[in-house]
Amino acid sequence: MVAIRKEQSLSGVSSEIKKRAKRNTLSSLPQETQPLRKVRIIVNDPYATDDSSSDEEELKVPKPRKMKRIVREINFPSMEVSEQPSESSSQDSTKTDGKIAVSASPAVPRKKPVGVRQRKWGKWAAEIRDPIKKTRTWLGTFDTLEEAAKAYDAKKLEFDAIVAGNVSTTKRDVSSSETSQCSRSSPVVPVEQDDTSASALTCVNNPDDVSTVAPTAPTPNVPAGGNKETLFDFDFTNLQIPDFGFLAEEQQDLDFDCFLADDQFDDFGLLDDIQGFEDNGPSALPDFDFADVEDLQLADSSFGFLDQLAPINISCPLKSFAAS
């Protein structure tokens, strides 16, 4: 009897659990069939017991303690990532597919032009090196790469024009100075001319440093030993030569001793007045009166110490050495 009751109780519990599970599944089923996520919850209740009978208590049969298990299933709709609607219409589907295929290919990095660099905040800065001042010149900040590249190219063309102008002017100055120096220092070379040939070629300095050849009017050939009148338009035979024969006469020579005459240097006194130079003998000194010294009273003051000299009481070392 006890075993039958146990089987009935277990069958009743299992049937009740199945009914509840069916109810939950039926109630949780959506009206429309869609993929769902099922969550199953299993709980074991150790304090839940079956109904006990007096017969079991009387028999006192030991039995293991039973635990009640509760199972619950909950269905959730699956969470799908909603796709953002494309801006293009269905007609542009083929175009978008082509764009996707192109973008999928590896992009080739574009080379930045010279003098342009990008800032951290996205702007494009341009600068160029000044070839004249040897410094960097700031061109500014631009929104796009193309604007910065255009500014760099324009400034570069400007600098190239300035440098080309300076080079041409320096070359022109150097060439003009060389040509002028050559025209000054180069000797004149005679050129043999014919009646049919042109005259000597002359170099004309142009501002563009281009030597041009200008022909001059031909001149007739002059034969050797020709007439002098044709060249100089003057007859030297008619030139009168002065007569210098008066220089050969007496006392007509150029007398330069007059410049050293004695009367010209009387104030300076020549050596003729000094005695003793012609005979190489002594000359008499002029008399000098020393009476003026007494008037100056030098005998009593300046030279008086000569009469007032103290006696020299110094023992002679030679006598003492001889005595010893």
Curated annotation (Swiss-Prot):
Residues 24-34 have a biased composition (Polar residues). One of its GO terms (molecular function) is DNA-binding transcription factor activity. Residues 109-120 have a biased composition (Basic residues). Pfam families: AP2 (PF00847). PROSITE patterns: AP2_ERF. Residues 112-170 bind DNA. The keyword S-adenosyl-L-methionine does not apply. GO terms for biological process: ethylene-activated signaling pathway. It is found in: Nucleus. Residues 1-120 are annotated as: Disordered. Residues 77-93 have a biased composition (Low complexity). One of its GO terms (cellular component) is nucleus. SUPFAM superfamilies: DNA-binding domain (SSF54171). Keywords: Activator, DNA-binding, Ethylene signaling pathway, Nucleus, Transcription, Transcription regulation. Probably acts as a transcriptional activator. Binds to the GCC-box pathogenesis-related promoter element. May be involved in the regulation of gene expression by stress factors and by components of stress signal transduction pathways. Belongs to the AP2/ERF transcription factor family. ERF subfamily. This is Ethylene-responsive transcription factor ERF118. It comes from Arabidopsis thaliana.
